[in-house]
């Protein structure tokens, strides 16, 4: 099977895209939340869905620990937030990870407690015991999803219809968890199924199709395959000269947005908004830098306001990645001009914009620090500016 370039996949996962300066689409995204001191207590309980079959539960958080139980794919397990101090390198579904272990208990067998590798656990809830979702209903959904073959396009529609039938009255944390399970299933179809092959081989694309997709003007009913993709929860994206399917978050929002908790609603609406425009193409930034700054600040404030959000790892990555791009650029959108080695005007403008509009944010503080170095260097690329950017990349990667 042909695969999408890894850099493009990473960019799409972290940041779907928002609207650029030239567009005025009303996406319905919420304004950046006000940065307030965290007022939520540390979660009493975490719930996770097991994403790998026969996942070992060990008595110690390492590969040498004795296996006390094997968790089934789709099983819901509970934990109190205890994380191992050590990390281990493990390859799951051909993807290498270096992650810690979580201490969890099987909800099927209360006597089965131990350490499970965290990369094989998908968090679906973090909060108090009193507001946790119905584990039986989540287990039923998770179990049903395991029966659907991810390599068959029709599985998307089956999953969506099951959720609509079974969770029509769900609200709050139950709706949050159901959304996560459904989105993760569709994402597995996107990345591990054969959908890329379908769009490469089954459609004779017309020349203007790519531009229509970029402008949100493509009619998904145009071809039998694209009509089927839409019915099964997918939309089209363009990148690196290819047309490929991704999960359509607008479809998820249509069902879940008025059911989920307020933080999840903000998260969902922002992700729908960002998916309107892919921020990258061919290694370059293709949205306005001021739009990218707005997104970075949204996620910074969101993370401050929701310190225990169930998808905190993802939202922190979004914040850090966007901040990194704004200060170090990308392969084909460089901070320093390739020929004269001076700061590109677009970056100088957005840094000034950030300093004026987003006073007090971490982004503004980082920009102020770097622009001070740039000013001393005459806005030229020097060993000092390069050293700062290298250290900044390392700091962001280690957070």
Regions found by a protein language model. Give the residues of each.
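C-terminal motif of bacterial Sec signal peptides marking the signal peptidase cleavage site
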Residues: 14-17
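N-terminal mature-domain "stem" immediately C-terminal to a signal peptide or N-terminal signal-anchor/transmembrane
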Residues: 36-39, 44-56, 63, 127-184
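Short solvent-exposed coil/turn linkers within tandem alpha-helical repeat scaffolds
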Residues: 64, 169-173, 250-263, 302-314, ...
